């Protein structure tokens, strides 16, 4: 299973980017056209994209066959085996 890369996040709310001169000119121009400052322009346009990427990475897609199999197991769970029973009885009693 792939692990997600860990990104160090500083405690401040600043984000520094290096872009080409042409890219910066285009971004500044687009922000001006929308009559917004550079920060608001970048944040308002990147947040939906970032959310879409995170949602896609964290969502599980199942085939119809997989869905039916899971529903069948939930509706008719198998009997617990010896290892599961032993593990359950080894747990501390949480009743108080």
From Swiss-Prot:
Phenotype of null mutants: Deleting the operon causes 50% reduction in persister cell formation in mouse bone marrow-derived macrophages. All 3 tacA-tacT operons can be deleted without an effect on growth in cell culture.
Triggers of expression: TacA3-TacT3 autorepresses its transcription at low TacT3 concentrations, at higher TacT3 levels it derepresses transcription. The tacA3-tacT3 operon is up-regulated 5-fold in a relA-spoT-dependent manner within 30 minutes of phagocytosis by mouse bone marrow-derived macrophages.
GO terms (BP aspect): regulation of DNA-templated transcription
UniProt-annotated stretches for the region Neutralization domain: 61-96
Subunit structure: Forms a complex with cognate toxin TacT3. Forms a 4:2 antitoxin:toxin complex with cognate toxin TacT3. Forms a 4:4 antitoxin:toxin complex with promoter DNA, where 2 TacT3 dimers bridge 2 TacA3 dimers. Only TacA3 contacts promoter DNA.
Domain notes per entry: The neutralization domain (ND) is sufficient to counteract the toxic effect of its cognate toxin, although other regions also play a role.
Its biological purpose: Antitoxin component of a type II toxin-antitoxin (TA) system. Counteracts the toxic effect of cognate toxin TacT3, but not TacT1 or TacT2. Plays a role in persister cell formation.
Record family assignment: Belongs to the TacA antitoxin family.
Protein name (Swiss-Prot/TrEMBL): Antitoxin TacA3
Source organism: Salmonella typhimurium (strain 14028s / SGSC 2262)
């Amino acid at each position: 299973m792939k692990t997600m890369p860990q990104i160090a996040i500083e405690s401040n709310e600043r984000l520094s980017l290096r872009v080409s001169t042409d890219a910066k000119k285009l971004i500044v121009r687009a922000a001006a056209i929308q009559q917004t400052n550079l920060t608001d322009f970048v944040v308002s346009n990147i947040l939906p994209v970032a959310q879409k990427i995170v949602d896609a990475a964290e969502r599980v897609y199942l085939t119809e066959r997989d869905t039916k199999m899971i529903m069948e197991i939930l509706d008719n769970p198998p009997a617990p085996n010896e290892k599961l029973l032993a593990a359950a009885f080894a747990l501390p009693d949480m009743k108080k």
